[in-house]
């Protein structure tokens, strides 16, 4: 049984170090503690707290107010002791936010925490669990978008990006899906029907609607990354900075990012993973091109770490992956947001029927056993946090036509 810390101890021993870790220096210029939301003037940035002689048990106080560079509030943090459910502070924190909203006319984000779990309440009152609180730069961008956000379902789709009717319909479906408040979408389209173009058109629509500014495109093969970068971002957003993430390539100031799962999951010195170079609120939209089924992120750590709209692109998933993929993207009744299969595409004359030759190989028939691989390949497995002695994958994983 763990030690039951008081709220004060929880803040000092757990919450303060987490805030410091993501860039909020408690006791510093941009973090105000024990702020009275009624007596403070958020317009003139005069924050009234306990230090001015007000009794803690008489007036209500915001545990933490996080400030932007101009010292205006951009988020509040409601803390509870470790033994209390995080959600217990939600009603209280919404009251504090209303006090701020009366003065500033905006709904700033709320973070709820007991030190072990963090929840985020956005301006639409949607609560969801997040890995960590967001840093100042990301909160600034999120609030800026929030002030200008429009309904993505009303955005005009760019015909230069998608011109086929089924592609246009796919883009509309996803934009309408996000318009209804969903945060994940799964686009299931047969190979060769234009998934990447559909994804780029969705990105374009969300940017026009001020729902997204920073986008991460995740792939499991370098060739897919090159396709997204060259035929997508460079072609349709020529004036926007693009960053291809790798061991040498890292920036937090680009608009579009392309990365393999392998890069994001690679270990960094002295500790941590590459993706942890970014804050949890670093991206407004993440597109996973088949990468959500990658062996390199079997626990979906990347998916869980970032708080963003998320789109999965996939051809027909294999039967053993289908359930997990649909659950990951919160597909209602086990159906993807968009489905355009091979035979639909053949009937639309987008694809032509194939004639396949079946070629049998040892890999297809026997699969792969890590302990039978060469030392070089076993070492490659270890770099991806797989244990060669126990690693096995069936040959069906590699069946392609």
Language-model features: locations:
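Amphipathic alpha-helical transducer elements in NTP-driven molecular machines
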Residues: 86-94, 258, 285, 293-296, ...
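Conserved motor-coupling elements within RecA-like helicase/translocase cores
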Residues: 245-257, 277
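SF2 helicase catalytic motif II
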Residues: 276-312
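ATP-dependent helicase/translocase motor core
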Residues: 1-76, 80-214, 219, 223, ...
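Short beta-alpha junctions and helix-cap segments that line functional grooves
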Residues: 202, 229-231, 243-246, 271-274, ...
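Substrate-gripping "pore-loop 1 plus following alpha2 helix"
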Residues: 270-284, 293-295, 323-338
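Interdomain helical connector at the RecA1-RecA2 junction of SF1/SF2 helicase-like NTPases
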Residues: 323-401
